[in-house]
Amino acid sequence: MKVRTLLCVCALLFSLTVAAQFQPERYPKREFRAAWIQAVNGQFRGIPTEKLKQNLISQLNSLQEAGINAIIFQVRPEADALYASQLEPWSRFLTGVQGQAPNPYWDPMEFMIEECHKRGMEFHAWINPYRVKTSLK
């Protein structure tokens, strides 16, 4: 009886060992290595559209080289928007005047989505839902 039990246990262990070799490979969870690009630090205001686009592209290239795989981009700094919106005015941090559309016209959020995806980066829109005004000039 003991020999029979021992043989059954050995057969079971052998079966489990063989079955374990055929399990699908488990991949580690992908790391979220993000950088935050904010609008309220003044990097947008007063800069011509093409220069601003080049600055953003340069930032994205540097961040990609550093291993960043996601961008968190501030799209609503103060109850306004850095994207075309039916509800919110254009941000003063983009044009210098709240409610004034960029000239020449462009949509910073759309631009950033396209540029992030060209680099295989995730894009995350960050909003300030409650901030109405800051003391920044």
Feature locations, PLM:
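Bacterial N-terminal signal peptides that target proteins for export
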Residues: M1-L7
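N-terminal signal peptide c-region/cleavage motif recognized by signal peptidases
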Residues: S15-T17
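Aromatic- and acidic-residue-enriched segments that line the glycan-binding/catalytic groove
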Residues: A81-G96, R131-K137
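The substrate-binding groove and active-site-proximal loops of carbohydrate-active enzymes
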Residues: V40-E50, W90-W106
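Catalytic domains of carbohydrate-active enzymes, especially glycoside hydrolases
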Residues: Q54-A81
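Active-site-adjacent "subsite" loops/lids of carbohydrate-active enzymes
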Residues: R30-F32, W36-Q38, G42-Q54, E114, ...
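Substrate-binding cleft of carbohydrate-active enzyme catalytic domains
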Residues: P108-V132
